[in-house]
A protein has these predicted regions:
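Bulky hydrophobic segments
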Residues: 1-173, 179, 193-205
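Extended hydrophobic secondary-structure segments
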Residues: 175-179, 183-187
């Protein structure tokens, strides 16, 4: 059993180190798919360790808190990299722009779909990606920080954070400031909050 737990942790650690090399190195750059696979491997390693150790560790709550914190740390590194440091963003000549008209970009996607100027796959990935981007953040914040289980602190925290991300991306020229991104990002964390408040799910935390 100890060997199995060690293998789970080793797997997660190796995947994490490989990803750090990808982030730090100027020559080795993985595709989004490979990065996603590495993240999944890390999470499987942590979950596998927790599952295998569930009957051995006396203070299970503390163990899960530590594992959740580690998973949160891994997520934050990946999120920061993808939002601000990904070289792919630097290689693209971004036209800095600001959109403060709600649903303007979303309607542009719809128009592009109708005119067949943009594949539906790209549109769906972009829309769903924006909705899901901060959902893991919402989960970790809700679970690890009790004040965030109240709606107002949770809502205000993510509103200011997501607006801040848009502003920084605009200033650093790694994206445009778009209110539709804020709407989609906020929709994701609010949907997650509602799900976490479902009685039988709420009991788990």
């Amino acid at each position: 059993m100890k060997h199995k737990r060690f293998l789970f942790l080793l797997t997660a650690a190796v995947a994490f180190i490989i990803q750090l090399i990808d982030i730090i190195s100027y020559t080795i750059k993985f595709s989004i798919t490979k990065t996603f696979v590495l993240i999944i491997i890390q999470m499987i390693g942590l979950v596998g360790y927790a599952y295998d150790a569930r009957n051995v560790v006396k203070n299970k709550r503390r163990m899960f808190t530590i594992l959740q914190s580690v998973a949160f740390f891994i997520y934050l590194i990946n999120l920061t990299y993808q939002l601000f440091l990904n070289p792919a963003l630097r290689h693209v000549k971004v036209i800095s722009s600001v959109n403060i008209s709600p649903l303007k970009t979303i309607l542009l996607y719809y128009t592009a779909y109708e005119r067949h100027t943009l594949p539906i796959k790209n549109i769906i990935l972009n829309m769903i990606g924006n909705v899901m981007l901060f959902m893991p953040f919402g989960f970790f914040v809700y679970v690890l920080f009790k004040p965030m289980r109240s709606f107002l602190p949770y809502f205000l925290f993510f509103l200011f954070m997501i607006v801040g991300v848009e502003v920084i991306q605009y200033i650093w020229k790694v994206g445009s400031a778009d209110i539709d991104d804020i709407i989609l990002n906020m929709s994701g964390v609010l949907i997650l909050y509602i799900v976490l408040k479902i009685p039988f799910i709420k009991k788990l935390f």
